[in-house]
A protein has these predicted regions:
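Phosphate- and other anionic-substrate recognition elements at nucleic-acid/protein interfaces
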Residues: 1-181
Length: 181
């Protein structure tokens, strides 16, 4: 899950095979989007934020309940450009964490953006294009194109970010080892 208050990326990926021959299959990818109805309000919480949080929370719960994943990776928040955007990021992360914790008793891990990028691409500062290319190469890219049909290119990056965490080989190794027990 790539959390946020404007865009939340979700990728459900099946990890199969035996180490080191790991296969990744896209099950579902979505981007849930909201925007304020009344413009910027100086960083205060209002009824409009409650509407947005409620929509994103129920959307995440729905995906988690539908697929019942063995492991949920939740991207940690990273630096923000302003106090307002930092507050929005914190709200988005908190709502995603609450949705995960209330919908499942399975394992959930928080993944730092820098660590995920370094493990997946070899570079902590990997750009959006490199992340997208890695995910398409490792997970069936055609399926991503189909799943995200109608989603603006600028918003697709959130689904790719969510997939990046699961498409890491170290995460796959842990999942496969646990299933073998």
């Amino acid at each position: 899950i790539d959390p946020g208050l404007c865009n939340v990326g979700v990728a459900v990926i099946d990890v199969a095979g035996r180490w080191p021959d790991v296969a990744y299959s896209l099950v579902d990818a979505r981007v849930f989007s909201t925007k304020p109805e009344h413009g910027k309000r100086g960083g205060t919480m209002c009824a409009d934020d409650a509407r947005r949080v409620g929509y994103l929370y129920s959307s995440l719960r729905g995906v988690i309940s539908a697929y019942k994943p063995d492991l949920i990776g939740l991207e940690e928040t990273s630096g923000s450009r302003s106090a307002r955007s930092g507050a929005a990021m914190a709200r988005g992360h908190t709502l995603a964490l609450c949705a995960v914790l209330s919908a499942t008793t399975k394992r959930a891990i928080e993944i730092s953006v820098a660590a995920a990028k370094e493990a997946a691409t070899g570079a902590q500062g990997a750009g959006k294009d490199l992340v997208r290319d890695l995910v398409i190469a490792r997970v069936n890219g055609v399926a991503f194109t189909d799943a995200l049909r109608g989603v603006a290119n600028t918003k697709r990056e959130h689904a790719f970010d969510a997939a990046m965490a699961v498409a890491r080989r170290d995460i796959a190794r842990v999942l496969l080892a646990e299933r073998a027990r």
